Amino acid sequence: MKYIIPIIILSFVLLSCAKKEDDSSSTTSTELEGTWVTSCNTASWSNTEYVIQTITVTGSALVWKWDEHSDSSCSNDYAIWTDTYSSLSLGSEVTLDNGSKGIKFTTIVDSIVGLMQTEAAATALNNYVFCGDSDWALNTTKDYSGKTCDNVAYPAKNATVSGVYKLDGSSLLINTGSITSVGSTVFTKQ
């Protein structure tokens, strides 16, 4: 009997330590809370178009926006592409392709939409039948989640998307669709 009480106490101590260790392996979304913006960069899909990306995290909601422009100073509006996600959940640390560390995350797709800000943009997408659609219209939001557009398969609404990010002070590198690379586009906290 005298050995049972110390064993019970030791069990509680070990469980308490294990619980604390488990808690440290995940991260809360508060470290991503706020607005993160890139500089004006050449668009990944065209070397004649330019984008400013903005990521806004509020609680477990994440909005990723690409403001597309027709000039290298990003002053002439062309289109806005917006991915809206919910249930953002930050996971454990992972090792990236370059050997550095990042944090894995998952989130759920609410919508993936485009908004043409010029007639030229709407006409170009209609002529190209982008996403299989020829009814893109000026200043009208169009959801293309779940579609394949220009050989890119976009996730459907309610799909779970995985990604990874790396945070260094006020600089953020982030990527969806991969948990081994964060890319090279730098977001700066506003």
Model-derived segments and their meaning:
Residues 1, 7-12, 29, 42, ...:
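Generic N-terminal initiation segments characterized by hydrophobic and/or small/turn-forming residues
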Residues 3-7, 12-36, 190:
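Bacterial Sec-dependent N-terminal signal peptides
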Residues 9, 28, 54-56, 80, ...:
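A generic structural signal for short, solvent-exposed coil/turn residues
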Residues 20-63:
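Acidic/polar, low-complexity intrinsically disordered N-terminal segments immediately downstream
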Residues 39-48, 63-169, 179-190:
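Contiguous, well-ordered beta-strand patches that form the walls/edges
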Residues 172-173:
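C-terminal amphipathic alpha-helix
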